[in-house]
Amino acid sequence: PSDSSKIWRKFSYGALMDVFMIDMYTKKDIDLITPSAYHILGQEQDFWLKNELSNSPARWKIVGNQKMIAGWSVVGLPAWFPGDGTYLTTSSWDGWDEARDALLLYLKNNNIHNVVFMSGDSHVTLVADLSDDPYDVGNYSGSSGAGSIACEFLPTSMTRGNFDEMG
């Protein structure tokens, strides 16, 4: 973007890849579960990202993502956890599940392939297939990856401990 107050941007590496750096902090609305009127990226950045992904001729489309986009649902959490015990945290895309679902559905409906989210700030190492409904075995297969819309990589923590190192 031409406005220097907007930190989201794209870096192109020829036909190999486009890297899209997004900003999840300056435009997001308050943390709510399923907030119909809210968006984690803000409308302008959401439009920009979808437009850039649609028009990218690169083989790989890498999205630099500050927080985990895969759902992190944990069975048996106390009801005082976000979403009445459904989510471990709402500071990730879990707090804006409608925005996440809309982005994944956009990728799927527009046949945008080879999208990789590189995420951070979760203090775990994780690789995930991203599906519009990972619990629907007719739509997604965890063993083969069939039905995956994109994938996500979270590297280990760089300067702080992971969950297994806290105590």
Feature roles, as predicted:
Residues P1-G167:
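Metal-dependent phosphoester/phosphodiester hydrolase catalytic core
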